[in-house]
């Protein structure tokens, strides 16, 4: 399974948006993470299309989470950025070639497909079981209780409007 880099960026943005008191422009999120503003903007647009963040227009505009962090799963973010399609798509290779199995004998998925479908299901269940709130907790455990408040203050400096 290979996820795009945008998934990592989007997850980090969702975590830090939990600290913001006002909408945060994508450019400010990109500056915080030292990443490409245009590429990050695409990830934020994907989150917005999925309804995970709201895009607020105007001088004090930016992005904000649309619901509590405990209600947004890692799977929600992965699917918003990389799509909801399956990780494995069976192409029935067993039916090809000079010794291929006749299609009428292929009435159920083969062992390869079954194990891949099971792995995809387990992977999705694992990502579904972790929320942005859980990731916030992990940041606090890994970096201490002042890390996220400091980020929140940097994202929304008092009186700046952004």
Identify the function of each model-found stretch.
Residues 51-66:
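Beta-hairpin "wing" of winged helix-turn-helix
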Residues 90-162:
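C-terminal regulatory/oligomerization modules of transcriptional regulators
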Residues 38:
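Key DNA-contact positions within bacterial/archaeal DNA-binding proteins
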